[in-house]
């Protein structure tokens, strides 16, 4: 073997072996238990970042561990390759998105291979290829035929200068990012998929996701947002019109003092015809980009419409106000306002001088609404026939009265809205719908799929090439002239079913059901928690759609989910002559000074600039604190980077990048290499004979098998990879101190090293692969079995007992493992140190904690 550890040399050799032998290519095998391990696939942005490396190292550790458990392991990889960044890069680089994307894929593919990830590259997919999106288009047409797809107008960001739709991230301070024109809201027709048809099932099945983090499940429950309430009908004074309002607090209905409606509500439009102030307010609201998330913090404003609503029970008239905090696309676009018992309504009423009435009070006292609304549930009062009822009784009594009088109905509502999948961008999968000459909209026939996205285009930064090219949209269906849809799919469409396509990526159908049902559901899914309410919800929804289409037979797409934490790094900047911050890479920091707690107090970069240190922040381009994985691999080797990633932090928590920690990981691998090379250089012909072992040799062997047990549990069940590494490091300390004098000494070291190679194989596979063979093991380590704990080795012949006198440790004694209290007490009392501390004292009490502690109380 090589005497010195040379990572670049051994990693190249091992990776060539994996490639030549197609080590990680798998097929279905009914005789083997399968394990499908999947990390969320990357967007091909150009280079891997450390967040990718952490995600994919975790996945690779799990996959390799399961392989050594004897399972048939699938670990695929691909590219989430449609999306807006490619369009922006194409505009900036004066190229088309396709070549930019494919170049990035090749570059990042090589980076993944350098890190030694054990992917089945024969299953590689890129979502921007027709071979992939053809089946997405086909499935969309099937959903349309089932009534799960529809088209309706919805609001978008519109640049009137460029006459184009803008993504939210292209709106900067209310203006177009390109020409600085104020952005307007415009209603245009868009395609939707009825995710709400699955809302109840998506919510209920969260309870079956035992292997998912509670935080993700809670976020999805809240996002789906099931509520039970009453939808009631209000009349409009002086008009024959009515409108509906939904509430989860019908117990407060008797306290309604005004009604708030969205600026886009039909009643607001009617009132605006004779109310210039209201008309101006409506225009202002329409041209603002208020999201649901912004409602909580923005200033609440409104204008009286001059209309009055008729209370459905009392018949009393209350004013109708148009308000900016009511959204037309959420609920009915109208809310009943009870300022006595809702803080937002209270603040609005105070601002505009509207009435505030209390109708709910605490069970054990009076209510004070002079300074703030009373928002708790309680007892109804000032509520006529409903006085004295508690929340539940009041809810039911008022609901029953509304239902009986035909003015309301009980209803379950969801916060979840149907999924708008239309995007007015170019670099996405074309939506496979056409409009015939007579205006009829139909799906593109299956024999005309895929609807190809032209890749040889010029990006002008203003309009999508397929919208600008009027000829592209022209087609024929069944001999009739037709126009293609020029919108493309939301890129969440591609990432909602890619996991299933990996099961049969070359199939001339969306999925091969036999293969899909062999591999699915995914056994372990790995990705960031930021995807909890978008990707992970669409992922679950799509799986149910695939199930109902007869393509898969499971209810959920993934059994277990691990959400890894972010990678942080030091961030530094200086102020340049223009007064602007210039962020400096940690790699360009020349010197630092630290206080006695290790905190950076001063830093200077390579150009002599004194820097401001802002602490550990998420690695990002904006703060220039990203560390290029490739630089680290070239400097230390892939195994070192992988080992640091697994050792530095539990997987769900943030990881602080410290090059000193990387250096420590590198030193550990070199120690392992040195120990193995020293062992290999000796005569190791004597086989292990447990019957010949001394007590010291048995103790060392016990450490080996305790480590096997701990690492197996840490990786397999707990997924605490950092403590698994720590356990092996501790074992290494024992092995380095152990003598290699006798044949049995060396036999134990040999057994230990053989185990260590397999324990570390998931984390540092190149080193483990190489040393496994150098140690004389037959066959490749990939085909070996995970080490098994020898339970007999864990049995201790003796125990080390701590002896305390009056609470202070005075001695440590070795006793037989099965020694009883009397014999332990006798040995302890006769220890020379104990005798010394008991001199002149009378023993009052002796407490024995079996196998651990002998405590003597004396005075």
From Swiss-Prot:
| Ranges spanned by the short sequence motif 'KMSKS' region, renumbered to the chain | 618-622
Q: Which UniProt keywords apply?
A: Aminoacyl-tRNA synthetase, ATP-binding, Cytoplasm, Ligase, Nucleotide-binding, Protein biosynthesis
User: Record-annotated residues binding ATP?
Assistant: 621
The top EC class, named as a word, is ligase
Task: Extract the CDD domains matched here.
Answer: Anticodon_Ia_Leu_BEm, LeuRS_core
Q: Which InterPro entries match?
A: aa-tRNA-synth_I_CS (IPR001412), aa-tRNA-synth_Ia (IPR002300), Leu-tRNA-ligase (IPR002302), Leu_tRNA-synth_edit (IPR025709), M/V/L/I-tRNA-synth_anticd-bd (IPR013155), Methionyl/Leucyl_tRNA_Synth (IPR015413), Rossmann-like_a/b/a_fold (IPR014729), tRNAsynth_Ia_anticodon-bd (IPR009080)
Q: Which reaction does it catalyse?
A: tRNA(Leu) + L-leucine + ATP = L-leucyl-tRNA(Leu) + AMP + diphosphate
Enzyme Commission number: 6.1.1.4
Look up the domain of life of the source: Bacteria
Report motif location: 'HIGH' region: 42-52
Gene3D superfamilies for this protein = 2.20.28.290, 3.10.20.590, HUPs (3.40.50.620), Isoleucyl-tRNA Synthetase, Domain 1 (1.10.730.10)
Q: Which Pfam families does the protein's record reference?
A: Anticodon_1, tRNA-synt_1, tRNA-synt_1_2, tRNA-synt_1g
Q: Biological process GO terms, please? A: leucyl-tRNA aminoacylation
Alphabetical list of HAMAP family matching this protein: Leu_tRNA_synth_B
Which family is annotated? Belongs to the class-I aminoacyl-tRNA synthetase family.
Q: By what name is this protein known?
A: Leucine--tRNA ligase
Give the source species. Answer: Shewanella putrefaciens (strain CN-32 / ATCC BAA-453)
């Amino acid at each position: 073997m090589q005497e010195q550890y040379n990572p670049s040399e051994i990693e190249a050799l091992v990776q060539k072996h994996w490639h030549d032998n197609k080590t990680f290519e798998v097929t279905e095998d009914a005789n083997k238990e399968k394990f499908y391990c999947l990390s969320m696939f990357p967007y091909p942005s150009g280079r891997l970042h450390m967040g990718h490396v952490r995600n994919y190292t975790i996945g690779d550790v799990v996959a390799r561990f399961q392989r050594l458990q004897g399972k048939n392991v699938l670990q695929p990889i691909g590219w989430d390759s449609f999306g807006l960044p490619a369009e922006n890069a194409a505009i900036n680089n004066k190229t088309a998105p396709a070549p930019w994307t494919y170049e990035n894929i090749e570059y990042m593919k090589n980076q993944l291979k350098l890190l030694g990830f054990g992917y089945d590259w024969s299953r590689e997919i890129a979502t921007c290829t027709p071979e992939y999106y053809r089946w997405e288009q086909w499935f969309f047409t099937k959903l349309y035929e089932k009534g799960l797809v529809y088209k309706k107008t919805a609001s978008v960001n519109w640049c009137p200068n460029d006459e184009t739709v803008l993504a939210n991230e292209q709106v900067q301070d209310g203006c177009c990012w390109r020409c600085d024109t104020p952005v307007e809201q415009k209603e245009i027709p868009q395609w939707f998929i009825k995710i709400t048809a699955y809302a109840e099932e998506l919510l209920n099945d969260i309870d079956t996701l035992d292997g998912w983090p509670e935080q993700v499940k809670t976020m999805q429950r809240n996002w789906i947002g099931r509520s039970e309430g009453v939808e009631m009908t209000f009349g409009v004074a002086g008009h024959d019109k009515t409108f509906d309002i939904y509430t989860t607090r019908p117990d407060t209905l008797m306290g309604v003092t005004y009604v708030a409606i969205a600026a886009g509500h039909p009643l607001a439009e009617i009132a605006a015809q004779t109310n210039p102030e209201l008309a101006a307010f409506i225009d202002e609201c329409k041209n603002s980009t208020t999201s649901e998330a912004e409602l909580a913090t923005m200033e609440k404003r409104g204008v009286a419409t001059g209309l009055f609503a008729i209370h459905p029970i009392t018949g009393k008239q209350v004013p109708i106000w148009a308000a900016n905090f009511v959204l037309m696309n959420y609920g009915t676009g109208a809310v009943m306002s009870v300022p006595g018992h809702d803080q937002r309504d209270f603040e609005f009423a105070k601002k505009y001088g509207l009435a505030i009435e209390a109708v709910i009070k605490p069970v054990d006292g009076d209510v004070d609404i002079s300074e703030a609304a009373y928002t708790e549930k309680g007892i109804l009062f000032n509520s006529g026939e409903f006085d004295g009822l508690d929340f539940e009784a009041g809810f039911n009594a008022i609901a029953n009265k509304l239902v009986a009088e035909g003015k309301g109905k009980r209803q379950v509502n969801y916060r979840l809205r149907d999924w708008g999948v239309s995007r007015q961008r170019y670099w996405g999968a074309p939506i496979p719908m056409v409009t015939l000459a007579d205006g009829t909209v139909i799906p593109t026939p299956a024999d005309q799929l895929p609807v190809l996205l032209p890749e040889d285009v010029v990006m002008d930064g203003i309009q999508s090439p397929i919208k600008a090219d009027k000829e592209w949209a022209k087609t024929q269906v069944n001999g009739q002239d037709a126009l293609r849809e020029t919108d493309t799919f939301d890129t969440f469409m591609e990432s909602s079913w890619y996991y299933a396509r990996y099961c049969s990526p070359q199939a001339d159908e969306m999925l091969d059901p036999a293969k899909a049902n062999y591999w699915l559901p995914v056994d372990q899914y790995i990705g960031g928690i930021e995807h909890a309410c978008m990707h992970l919800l669409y992922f679950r929804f799509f799986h149910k759609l695939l199930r109902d289409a007869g393509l898969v037979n499971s209810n959920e797409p993934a059994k277990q989910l691990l959400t890894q934490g972010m990678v942080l790094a030091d961030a530094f900047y200086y102020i340049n002559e223009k007064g602007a911050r210039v962020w400096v890479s940690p790699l360009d920091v020349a010197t630092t000074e630290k206080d006695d707690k290790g905190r950076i107090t001063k830093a200077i970069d390579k150009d002599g600039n004194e820097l401001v240190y802002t602490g550990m922040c998420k690695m990002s381009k904006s703060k220039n604190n990203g560390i290029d994985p490739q630089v680290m691999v070239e400097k230390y080797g892939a195994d070192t980077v992988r080992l640091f990633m697994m050792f530095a932090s539990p997987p769900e928590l943030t990881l602080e990048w410290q090059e000193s920690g990387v250096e420590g990981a590198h030193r550990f691998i070199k120690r392992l290499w040195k120990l193995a090379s020293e062992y290999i250089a000796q005569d190791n012909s004597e086989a292990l004979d447990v019957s010949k072992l001394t007590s010291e040799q048995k103790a060392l062997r016990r450490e080996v098998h305790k480590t096997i047990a701990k690492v197996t549990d840490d990786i397999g069940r707990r997924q605490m990879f950092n403590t698994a590494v720590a356990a092996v490091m501790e074992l290494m300390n024992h092995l380095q101190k152990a003598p290699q004098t006798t044949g049995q000494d060396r036999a134990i070291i040999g057994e230990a090293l053989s185990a260590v190679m397999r324990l570390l194989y998931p984390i540092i596979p190149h080193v483990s692969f190489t040393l496994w063979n150098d140690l004389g093991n037959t066959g490749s380590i990939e085909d070996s079995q995970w080490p098994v704990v020898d339970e007999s080795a864990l049995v201790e012949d003796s125990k080390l007992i701590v002896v305390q006198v009056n609470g202070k440790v005075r001695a440590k004694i070795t006793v037989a493992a099965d020694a009883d209290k009397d014999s332990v007490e006798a040995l302890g009392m006769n220890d020379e140190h104990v005798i010394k501390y008991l001199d002149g004292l009378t023993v009052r009490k002796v407490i024995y904690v079996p196998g651990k502690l002998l405590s003597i109380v004396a005075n």
